């Protein structure tokens, strides 16, 4: 199949500046990532008080009820009427006036016209020439919508300008943001159904294989790769091959293992595990194009269908293995759990548990969010839900997800944070996308090109700076009969330093029998 598809060679990166502390903190200069020139922190949860918010929610209806001389039912009535306006007002005020978490990073304080070009007189007057000609910061949600509609442009490279967004954008909550959250996201969270999953996944992944070849490259893997060397710029293919190798090692993959790959995408891991390790892999995806691509790829690698296959089905309808027990030795779920919806997350993990042999292992790669949030984190998450991954509302802080894992009977063996690895992967996707601009625009239009340019560029920043991150979990059933000692050799994070040598103390000889 790859012989019939042309991929761009990832365009060369521009030369990056050396590390310095000109902005107030020391920046990095690794060729593996796009290094942050302005890693500023904005306002966030440290100045947000739930106590004050809940007090206002209770006291405002209470005060009105008291003045009217009425009772509890009246309080409930006014609470229901006023709750949403109070919430909107409080979040708007706090996101507008809260102080930054810290001010170690100093803003350049350049005029907004240094970064952006507005294309209508009204927008120029509002943002570019106001405030004595210096302009005013634009709410990031407002900017997104204007940019997608072609009413404002970056002066320079999208990613380079987004690196300085704290200097030209605010993270104030807007009416449009509230509208989407209340009328778009909340109903999806509540009603997250199987038919909804099918509609959203197929709309996203069956858009056209060419759409994804234009940024994913030959491996066609839509998940984070892994950096192995921070002193050089590894190719996108190297990052993904690193990840595949890490996955196989972490689950101690062996010939003949029966593996279920939930959300298998275009079948690259399925093909890798089948061809290199001789595993029997069943990959499942809702994408029809992905199913066709994956099965063709397996055939090209000489994998018979009675060994491995890609099945187009919902995870709730995953087929049983060919083992007498019908269960799997290993299960892999790579950035799939986020899409099941927070309401069904526990049920999804229970299904993984029930499909796994008692001595099996679960590899789960999961995109998460930081608990100590900043307003830019919340706005980025809402953008992602609106434009990129509708229904993917189960990205959560680590503590919540780990609690769900443990509550269904899994024991977490290890967890690795690979957020900066994701940033490296996204940086290469971004450059591929920019390099294929003409192809994208000719087929899908300027708006789709801009949406995904912004998505990829902002995600490079978000996953490097901590707005979003990614975790690799290895889990096993938390039962007494599990032979835990067998997995010790695979715990490379523990074994590596030990094998390098541990001798340090003076020899002790004063023993007694």
Swiss-Prot record:
Function statement: Catalyzes methylation of the sphingoid base component of glucosylceramides (GluCers) at the C9-position. Sphingolipid C9-methylation requires 4,8-desaturated ceramides as substrates. Glucosylceramides play important roles in growth, differentiation and pathogenicity. The methyl group at the C9-position distinguishes fungal glucosylceramides from those of plants and animals, and may thus play a role in host-pathogen interactions enabling the host to recognize the fungal attack and initiate specific defense responses.
Organism of this sequence: Candida albicans (strain SC5314 / ATCC MYA-2876)
Lipid metabolism listed as a keyword: yes
Pfam family name, one: CMAS
Assigned EC number: 2.1.1.317
Gene giving rise to this polypeptide: MTS1
Entry protein name: Sphingolipid C9-methyltransferase
SUPFAM superfamilies xref list: S-adenosyl-L-methionine-dependent methyltransferases
Superkingdom of the organism of origin: Eukaryota
Known pathway: Lipid metabolism; sphingolipid metabolism
Catalyzed reaction equations: a (4E,8E)-4-sphinga-4,8-dienine ceramide + S-adenosyl-L-methionine = a 9-methyl-(4E,8E)-sphinga-4,8-dienine ceramide + S-adenosyl-L-homocysteine + H(+)
Any one GO BP annotation for this protein: filamentous growth
Binding residue positions for S-adenosyl-L-methionine: 222-223, 259-267, 285-290, 315-316
Membrane-related topology note: Multi-pass membrane protein
EC class name: transferase
Gene Ontology CC entries for this record: extracellular vesicle; plasma membrane
Membership in a protein family: Belongs to the CFA/CMAS family.
């Amino acid at each position: 199949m790859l012989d019939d598809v042309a991929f761009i060679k990832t365009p060369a990166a521009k030369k990056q500046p050396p590390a310095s502390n000109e902005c107030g903190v020391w920046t990095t200069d690794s060729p593996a990532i796009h290094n942050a020139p302005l890693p500023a922190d904005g306002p966030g949860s440290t100045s947000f008080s739930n106590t004050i918010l809940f007090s206002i929610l209770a006291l405002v209806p209470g005060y009105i009820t008291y003045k009217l001389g009425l009772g509890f039912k009246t309080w409930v009535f006014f609470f229901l009427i006023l709750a949403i306006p109070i919430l909107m007002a409080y979040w708007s005020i706090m996101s507008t006036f809260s102080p930054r978490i810290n001010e170690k990073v100093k803003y350049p304080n350049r005029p907004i016209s240094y970064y952006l070009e507005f294309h209508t007189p009204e927008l120029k007057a509002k943002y570019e020439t106001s405030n004595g000609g210096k302009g005013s910061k634009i709410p990031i949600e407002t900017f997104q919508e204007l940019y997608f509609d072609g009413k404002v442009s970056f002066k320079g490279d999208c990613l380079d300008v987004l690196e300085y967004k704290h200097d030209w954008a605010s993270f104030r909550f807007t009416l449009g943001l509230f509208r989407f959250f209340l009328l778009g996201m909340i109903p999806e969270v509540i009603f997250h159904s199987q038919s909804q999953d099918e509609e959203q996944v197929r709309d996203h992944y069956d858009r056209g294989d060419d759409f994804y070849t234009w940024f994913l490259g030959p491996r066609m893997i839509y998940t984070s790769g892994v950096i192995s060397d921070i002193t050089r710029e590894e190719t996108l293919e190297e990052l993904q091959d690193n990840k595949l190798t890490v996955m196989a090692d972490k689950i101690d993959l062996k010939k003949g293992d029966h593996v279920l790959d939930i959300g298998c995408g275009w079948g690259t891991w399925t093909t890798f595990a089948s061809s290199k390790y001789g595993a029997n892999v069943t990959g499942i995806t809702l994408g029809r194009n992905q199913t066709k691509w994956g099965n063709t790829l397996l055939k090209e690698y000489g994998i018979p269908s009675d060994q491995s296959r890609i099945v187009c089905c919902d995870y709730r309808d995953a087929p049983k293995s060919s083992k007498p027990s019908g269960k799997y030795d290993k299960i892999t779920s790579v950035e799939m759990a986020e899409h099941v919806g927070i309401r069904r997350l526990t049920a999804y993990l229970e299904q993984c548990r029930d499909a796994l042999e008692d001595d099996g292992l679960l590899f789960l790669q999961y995109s998460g969010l930081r608990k100590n949030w900043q307003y830019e984190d919340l706005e980025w998450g809402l953008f992602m839900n609106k434009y990129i991954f509708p229904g993917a509302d189960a990205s959560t802080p680590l503590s919540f997800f780990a609690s769900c894992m443990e509550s269904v009977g899994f024991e977490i063996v290890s967890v690795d944070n690979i957020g900066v690895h994701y940033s490296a992967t996204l940086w290469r996707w971004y450059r591929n996308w920019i390099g294929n601009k003409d192809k994208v625009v000719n087929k899908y239009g300027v708006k789709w090109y801009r949406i995904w340019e912004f998505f990829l560029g902002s995600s490079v920043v978000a996953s490097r700076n901590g707005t979003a991150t990614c975790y690799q979990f290895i889990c096993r059933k938390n039962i007494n009969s599990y032979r835990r000692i067998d997995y010790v050799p695979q715990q490379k994070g523990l074994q590596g330093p030990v094998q390098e040598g541990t001798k340090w103390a003076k020899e002790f000889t004063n023993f007694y029998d």
